[in-house]
Structures are given as C-alpha cells and as structure tokens.
Amino acid sequence: MEGNPQSCEDPEAIKNMSLAEFINQPNVTGFHAQDSGRLRAYVESNPYVRIGTELPGGYVIGYVFEDRFEQLILELQESFVAIRPTLFTLLDRESLESASIIKVQELPAANLRGEGVLLGFVDTGIDYTHPAFLYEDGTSKIQYIWDQTIRGDSPKDMHFGSQYSQAKINEALASKNPFSVVPEQDTNGHGTFLASIAGGRENNNYIGAAPDAEIIAVKLKPASKFNLNFSAVPRGTTAVFTSDKIMLGIKFILDKADELNRPVVICIGLGTNFGGHAGRSIIEEYISHINTRRGIVIISAAGNEANARHHTGGRIPATGNSETIEVLVGENVSSFAA
C-alpha cells in the first residue's frame, strides 16, 4: 500500500491505510488549520483527508490527497483558505550578521555559556560529526535529531521521518561509518552553520555563543512539487520548506524539551515574502502562542530587505469595488510570463 499513488482511486483501500501509510503516500500533501468540530466532521466523512498531529493552541496538521485539496477548501469555505502552507526559504549569512546574531559571541563579559539550556534548530539538519558538537571525550552534545526526509523510527504523533537519540548518535560516532548508523546529513550546511554559531564547542580559537548548551536539530522535508507549482516558485529552486513542517519541527523540539525538563531556545533561520506579515497567519499565531509558555523562547531573524518593496497594502472600501495593483516581475519568473 505504501508509496502507491494509484490507491487514491479506491476509497476502501484508503480507509484501511494506517495514518503513517496515508501520510507517506507520494501524492498526499500537508496542511495546517485551527481545530474545529466542522473540520473533524468533514474529515470523518471524507476518506481522502486525515488529521495527523494535534498542536498546542488548538491547531492541527492534516493531510489530503493533492487532487482533493481545492475541494477541501471549497467545501470548508472561506474560513479555511489559510490552511494552505506558506513557503519559507533560508536566510543568508549576511542577513544574520546584519541582525547582530553573530555579535552575541563578542560579549565575553556576560559569561553566559548556556549550561542546562537546550538549543533547537528547525532548518536543513546538522552535521553531527562536526567537532563543534563534540565533547572532549568524542561524544555528542546533540540530544536529538529528527530527519523529516528519512523513513524510520518516527516521533510520537508525527508518523513520518526518523528520530535519533543522543545514545544512537554516540553509537554512530564510535563506528567506522557513522552515516550507516545515523544517516542524517546536512547537505546544505545552513543548519550546521546556525548551530555552530549558537552552540558550538571551543575548537581552534572558535567558540559558539552558548557552548555548554545542548542541541535538538530538525532537518526539514523540502516542499513538494505540488506546493512549489502553486506558489509559482521558479524551477530549480532548492531549500524551500512549508510552514506545516516547520510547525511540526517546533513541536518535536518542545516535546523533547518537556521530556528532559529543560528550558529551550528555538532558532528559525528561515523567512518568506508570502503572506501579510501582520502576525495573523497560522504559523505566526502558533509561534505567538508557544512564546507565552515559561521556559520557551522562539527567535527568528527578520531578514535584511529594507526597502526592497516585496509587500504592498491598500484598502477596498466596499463590496464590489476593485483596485489595481501593479506588480514588477523579475527576469526568468516563468510562472508570471504573459
């Protein structure tokens, strides 16, 4: 059953799938929504939609077959339009430097080393073999890794990806071929860069801002072709992720911090030009809710676009009126070609 897109033609076969089988179908996509009786009733009556994970604050991550997504929105109507995930990509090093994140390292008088604190990263993963994340005895300062791209021992209530504990990471480090034990790799390097800046151990005159803090890292699953095409992302664009997977990454880190009974700082080095940027999207509201909890801080660089004019605003005074907004389209953006 797993991985067979033709099973979408058989409602009975879909009903008999486990949640993990359903989620891992190649033509199933995720969405996020506020939980409600109306949504639950729709899911109960429709075999092509499942609720996967309940999140703090009354939010859920759901899954639907791609060719049923528009039907889902149409039948649940306008209050559910925001269920479609927003696309995020990586903030570059220059943006992080401009936000003064790296300058935290230059405050030795503070004498804050992060002992007893967890650092969480929702990004491209982490190179767990890097010396910046090893103690003097060669063991890892990484408590957990969740690789959303690998099938394996998925976290509780997530139903996809593979998680690795500190014990498993140490087993990998002690072996001749670490990646045969823990196959997670940060092929981009962005997540490793952020983690080393924030929590790298002292190594060759280099030291992170909180070298005694331990780490939980999430390697995000890239956005599907279905989501990229809908948002007119140019062909060949890489390192693009969806807000539903980011929200799940945050939940994973929070769950592990609760298990360890330790405070956590979660770093999200991602940004987007989609949406209103007014704090009212589902992911923004979710993060705002999480930030009210004691012992939890979520931080994100805001970018360095200044007056790049990626957003506009206006007011339509009455129903039936219209306004025209001119859009300047860059070169080689084929989705906006005339």
Write out the residue ranges for each language-model feature.
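Substrate-binding/access-modulating region of protease and related hydrolase catalytic domains
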Residues: F226-I316, N332-A337
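A generic structural signal for alpha->beta connector loops
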Residues: Y48, S79, T139, D212, ...
